[in-house]
Amino acid sequence: MIGALARRLFGSPNDRRIKAYQPRVDAINALEPELVALSDEALRGRTAEFRQQLADGKTLDDILVPAFATVREAAKRTLGQRHFDVQLIGGMVLHEGDIAEMKTGEGKTLVATLAVYLNALAGKGVHVVTVNDYLARRDSAWMGEIYGFLGMTTGVIVHGLDDQQRQAAYACDITYGTNNEYGFDYLRDNMKYRLEDMVQRGHYYAIVDEVDSILIDEARTPLIISGPLDDRSEFYNTIDTFMPSLDKATDYEVDEKQRTVTLTEAGMEHIEVLLRDAGQLKGDSLYDVENVSVVHHVNQALRAHSLFQRDKDYIVRDDEVVIIDEFTGRMMPGRRYSEGLHQALEAKEHVQVQPENQTLASITFQNYFRMYEKLSGMTGTALTEADELFDIYKLEVVEIPTNVQIARLDEDDEVYRTQSEKYAAILAEVERANSRLQPVLVGTASIEKSEVLGEYLKKHGYKQIDFTDPKGMEKLYAAARAGKPAKLFAVLNARFHEQEAYIVAEAGVPGAITIATNMAGRGTDIKLGGSLEMRIQHETVGITDEAEKAAKIELIKADIERFREIVLKAEEVVEVEPAKGNKPAKTLTRPGGLYIMGSERHESRRIDNQLRGRSGRQGDPGRSKFFLSLEDDLMRIFGSDRLDTMLTRLGLKEGEAIIHPWINKALEKAQQKVEARNFDIRKNLLKFDNVQNDQRKEIFDHRISLMKDDSVAETVAGMRHDFIDDIVAKHVPEHAYAEQWDVAGLKEELERVLGLDLPVDEWAKEEGIADEELLTRIEQRVDEHMAAKVGQWGPEVMRYAEKSILLQTLDHLWREHLVMLDHLRNVIGLRGYGQRDPLQEYKSEAFALFEAMITHLREAVTAQLMRVEIVPPEQPQELPPMEGHKFNADTGEDDMAFANVSLAPADNADKTARNPNDPSTWGKVGRNEDCPCGSGKKYKHCHGRYA
């Protein structure tokens, strides 16, 4: 109560912050007449002036006012668009490294140009992040006109570019691209072997469009670059055949709220019998140690069948299982579930089972975007997640006032008993709206629901068309011109991802009915009457005569203006009180414009708000209403029992709905609970991922420093000496008498690992020899051996071999380490049953694994360099330069190391040249020979185990 009074007296913190920007807005406006008078050349020249001012010691804040004024004038001259005052405020929020919440249609794309231009003046590169390739291309070309006019370069990063094209795009002043492309480029860069092959040039400043979608909705999904493991498709198909025979009532239990499934005791026995009959069970029990991986795959198959639904969680396209983003309804080609779940889904759908992958590199969006020196974002809906955005990213959400007041009517939800009653109500409402040519957008939570609704409309006389088909659209236009409903609808979901921009753009045509999966981050405005740009683009194709083209454009403009008037007048007048005597009937007028109908509530209020926000742009009228049933997922899982009881008490008949603000509040509370739970999950995942992230930064930083060094000889020598110290310390304990030394063990290990037969036993017999002296002699002999190699090969070749072996070995061990961390993370939760904190246990064990990896690195690098020999080619030729190599971005394999240089163990010089990192070059290896990988182990105990 006191807080509400204070807000009325002093304004909210958001109001006060907006007010604080006003003096700078006034200053920008005051500069406008001066800039209007400048020539194009003079306006363009201001970029060089600003850069000089920065070089002279001024800060970006010092030049914000003139820089923003310059961008506004450039936008007027290139795009014919002038930034509103509220857009200037949005630009300031972005520059300060916070989130600007701006309603749909308020021009977020144009707002970004202010902060982008100002920060690009620093010359460090600005990254603008979009949710798909279409928007990246569109915005870079569209806003690039402003930047190009002001003398700045713009690049775009989309799927399918090669490294050279990516380098050129990142070298630009401003780079547009998707969150996925930025993240994958970072991972690929840290798998390369030379600095000049890396494409990114740092992480200075990023503006994330649809920031809530990327930093919250996708935060749980890591970006992973992986390589294939052995093919086990038959095993997955065998396990899948067991699933139909399991009984949900007795064999397993499903918890939809927690999205878990567990086998019952009876289910375990049933599976044991099936596995034994199929010859897949080792030992007597399903839970014997040797069956751990079998249990894991059974559980994944069970999850695939009971928790994952086709056309909701994934679709099958071109014989592949493609994941669907649960929040946006978008397909995510290239993304695969890990831990064998994707293979289980492929077996379930009877498509080709792809081999499991080994993680080569991974990072979450949370950790990727936190690398930027400054991060900001834009969205239409972030206030509901403001706490999370600040807690994790230290980003404050600032609500930017609309340029024109929102005129949309948001009506209370209608709640029905069953899905069929709900669909009947939606159909009736669609028919009423269509009869007055009011465009309708029906939002659904999944592809499955959108297609069910589409079939429902077809049964009742509606025809599905493709909004990208000129013939179909002409029918819709003709009906609108005639003032008649066409009864035509289009479906927008992940299946039609490629046409989504055009379908959305035409959803504002009179009489248009669009069924769409979640509209989060679609990025295309729905303009009443239709999209001028889209129609010009499609209807002027093939017209070469300029006069004819201009005439056609004028016709399209007139058409759209007429359509806009029709949509604005599509109001619904409802009689709320009949006429009595001389007293006229009392009516209620509901606005025209775009009518948003939600077919169910999403778990997140933000997604619902995004759907509502498609209507009412720039002060246009509009309506929104949600139609729900007790059979909807949210209602069913999170407390429909109380509502069902309430509806029963009210005596609700079939087909009747309950409409009350209390229902809305109850639903909002349910959504808040789900949001809080999801926030806790993301926060907990981040704590675990931070452990791996710290190690990742350490490894990647070390890798880059190694690539920067011309020679890693000092590093390699240090690793060699540390490794020898460890061996000697193991066999010659400190302060022990010579009689207590394990001389035989020391000699054997030195010979096994280093390939040197040193007279350690003779040295140990010398009178008065100390352990330090023994260590020094061993190090001297080993150093002499390496010096001889330098003399034999030459310093250039030695530098090349050392760096190649060090980087490749580091990469190999890091990949194995990631697998170990994944396994550790999967089981560490069980420590909670022993009253231990799983996070602390994970930190402790992950650190121990990291230390073991570093120790192994020292051993492996030392062993390989001690044993490797260069076999001269048959014909003399110059050593190839280091730049000649090919990088496989999919697997992370790089053939740069050892390119054109044959390497083989010294004691096998007469055999085929062997590359320690490429088993295909080893040929036949005897079981008791040393493993060619250089580990120092016998082949049968090393790679021979997998042969």
UniProtKB/Swiss-Prot annotation:
GO terms for cellular component: cell envelope Sec protein transport complex; cytosol; plasma membrane. CDD domains: DEXDc_SecA, SF2_C_secA. It catalyses: ATP + H2O + cellular proteinSide 1 = ADP + phosphate + cellular proteinSide 2. ATP binds at residues 87, 105-109, 525. May bind 1 zinc ion per subunit. Disulfide bonds: none annotated. Gene3D superfamilies: Helical scaffold and wing domains of SecA, P-loop containing nucleotide triphosphate hydrolases, SecA, preprotein cross-linking domain. Its cofactor is Zn(2+). InterPro entries: Helicase_ATP-bd, P-loop_NTPase, SEC_C_motif, SecA, SecA_CS, SecA_DEAD, SecA_motor_DEAD, SecA_preprotein_X-link_dom. Residues 905-928 are annotated as: Disordered. The keyword Translocase applies. It comes from the Bacteria. It is a peripheral membrane protein. One of its GO terms (molecular function) is protein-exporting ATPase activity. Signal peptide: none annotated. GO terms for biological process: intracellular protein transmembrane transport; protein import; protein targeting; protein transport by the Sec complex. Monomer and homodimer. Part of the essential Sec protein translocation apparatus which comprises SecA, SecYEG and auxiliary proteins SecDF-YajC and YidC. This is Protein translocase subunit SecA. It comes from Rhodopseudomonas palustris (strain BisB18). The lineage of its organism: Bacteria, Pseudomonadati, Pseudomonadota, Alphaproteobacteria, Hyphomicrobiales.
